[in-house]
Design a protein with these regions (language model features):
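Active-site nucleotide-donor binding segment shared across nucleotidyl transfer reactions
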Residues: 10-55
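Conserved catalytic core of two-metal-ion nucleotidyltransferases
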Residues: 61-98
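Hydrophobic-cavity lipid-handling domains and compact docking modules
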Residues: 49-67
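Catalytic cores of NTP-dependent nucleotidyl/adenyl transfer enzymes across multiple folds
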Residues: 95-137
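Residue-level signal for secondary-structure boundary sites
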Residues: 49-51, 92, 101-103
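Residue-level preference for alpha-helix termini and adjacent loops
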Residues: 27-28, 83, 100, 124
């Protein structure tokens, strides 16, 4: 179950970074992910360094990046980002300012505000998914 393992990795990352109000976005949330899709998270912090320090506290190696995000049809902004892995699953984080939680970027698919799921919503998605088939039963 591809989505299940990707969403579980997302949930682990979201729980470890809970103080930054994480939101799952993109193909893993929408159900269109492939085995090569990264888990995409939006975090909210005064500075990206605080997120990096939290990853260091958890012993998670990471890479600092920058992400260009379309906030409206005519406005593209650059935000700091981080890349790391949880259980061999690539995680791509974009760090927005604290007030960024109120305005989602526009979706590259349909131009509407991007759907975001908080930890509770991701847990509910996982509960609604069938368990992987086990040959032991």
């Amino acid at each position: 179950m591809l989505f299940r393992s990707q969403r579980r990795a997302a949930l682990v990352a979201m729980q470890q970074l809970r103080e930054f109000e994480p939101r799952l976005v993109g193909p893993v949330l929408s159900g269109t992910a492939t085995q090569h899709s990264e888990v995409q998270l939006h975090l909210f912090a005064d500075c990206a360094e605080s997120v990096a320090l939290k990853l260091i506290d958890h012993g998670i190696a990471h890479e600092v990046t920058e992400r260009r995000v379309r906030m409206s049809p005519e406005r593209v902004l650059a935000y700091p980002g981080l890349r790391f892995a949880i259980d061999d699953q690539a995680i791509d984080v974009t760090v927005f300012p604290m007030d960024g939680i109120r305005q989602a970027p526009v979706s590259p698919v349909d131009g509407r505000p991007m759907r975001r799921a908080n930890t509770v919503e991701v847990e509910a998605l996982l509960e609604g998914e069938p368990a992987p088939f086990s040959e032991d039963t």
